[in-house]
Amino acid sequence: MKKQGFTLIELMVVIVIMGILAAVAVPKLFGMIAKSKASEVPTAAGTYINLQDAYVVEANALGTWSKVGYTGPGTSSAGGSEGGIFYYLEGTISSNTGTLWKAQARQKLNECNKDGKWGLAVGIQGGEAEGQSNAVYKTGASTGCGDLTPSFDKLTSGRNSTGLTVSL
């Protein structure tokens, strides 16, 4: 009679190998999950930038969210919108500048603490005639939050203004 099966040592080796793989893979998995959740931020900011750009060219001024036609992801609420992972907050225009768009984490995402923020300061440069003005931007993020969204800073490449301050 022929016996088939695995020896105890073979099973233990397989269990040890699976344990090592799990120890390496689990932290990476959580990092990837946090980055995928945070990927919503650059997408929402990019939509806002496109709408604000069009409004500035047409109106020669910065516009509020309602004027430019922007609605943050999620359910509209006072001063912005509320999504599952982020609050999106509208800023105030002062002298054609301001931090007019913010995202605030509703939960901890890796090194980005709960209530960590991403912000987008907006200003105007150019002439006073219609179509001569351009919006300029500056991005900022709370400690640990920017690392989750490397594409957030790239949204404004070529249109950065060092004179703007991002108020988080």
Question: Which residues fall in each region the model found?
Answer:
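Periplasmic/extracellular, small/polar-rich flexible segments of pilin-like filament-forming proteins
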Residues: 57-168
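N-terminal single-pass transmembrane signal-anchor helix
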Residues: 1-37, 41, 48
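Conserved hydrophobic/amphipathic alpha-helical signal-anchor segments
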Residues: 31-74
